[in-house]
Amino acid sequence: MLKEQLIAEAQKIDASVALDSIFESVNISPEAKETFGTVFEATVKQHAVKLAESHIAKIAEKAEEEVEKNKEEAEEKAEKKIAEQASKFLDHLAKEWLTENKLAVDKGIKAELFESMLGGLKELFVEHNVVVPEESVDVVAEMEEELQEHKEESARLFEELNKRDAYINYVQREVALSESTKDLTESQKEKVSALVEGIDYSDAFSSKLSAIVEMVKKSNKDESTITESINTPDTEEAGLNFVTEAVEDKSAQGAEDIVSVYAKVASRF
């Protein structure tokens, strides 16, 4: 690697020629000259290694910044595309369901109107002592039975519609939460999730969520500042401890989380 090559080249530096010219006119013992030369050469090599590591650290830092920038752009594009596709998919499901159940919904409304009308006629017959022929009783009973069936079917369909609306609200809530906390740490995400747990999804949910996220960020700001101060090297020797840390790719994970939410809700349809 580049770092090892630069360090190896630094170790090959030979300062003996320069020292010979320096001590050429100086009367000094060979032992003292050799000792001084050893110390001088070691110092030169040490500074050369430090200089090489400093340049490598700057190059690595610039590369990491570029990678992080590209990762954020890719993550933003992926989440935007997934959200658009999921929104279209849910709209399509809702339209299909309304089309398939339009007849049943209409029948339910008509059944309620018929029940009201039939009840009014019954009261009218009783008030005016109108006697219904016996052969008509079966017809009325059948109509009442059919009416009851329509009422039950209508109630079932409306219950199913309410459940689907609840699922849609759930996935929109989860997407909003995932989008707002994508730049937070895991501990901060847990705090936000705990704080919004009792808040129902509504038009005001986004503003409440934003306020909670900002509050969590602010509460962790001082802690982050202290941590950065502790981790910042104060000496030149500490700056040489070049450590490469693995960066977790959160773009794919964030996209997979959103897809799993939509897939879970879509499976209920």
From Swiss-Prot:
Name this protein carries in UniProt: Capsid assembly scaffolding protein
Gene assigned in the entry: 22
Q: Return the similarity comment.
A: Belongs to the T4likevirus capsid assembly scaffolding protein family.
- UniProt KW keywords: Viral capsid assembly, Viral release from host cell, Virion
Name the residues that span the membrane.
none
Q: Name one GO cellular component term.
A: virion component
Query: Any signal peptide, and if so, which residues?
Result: none
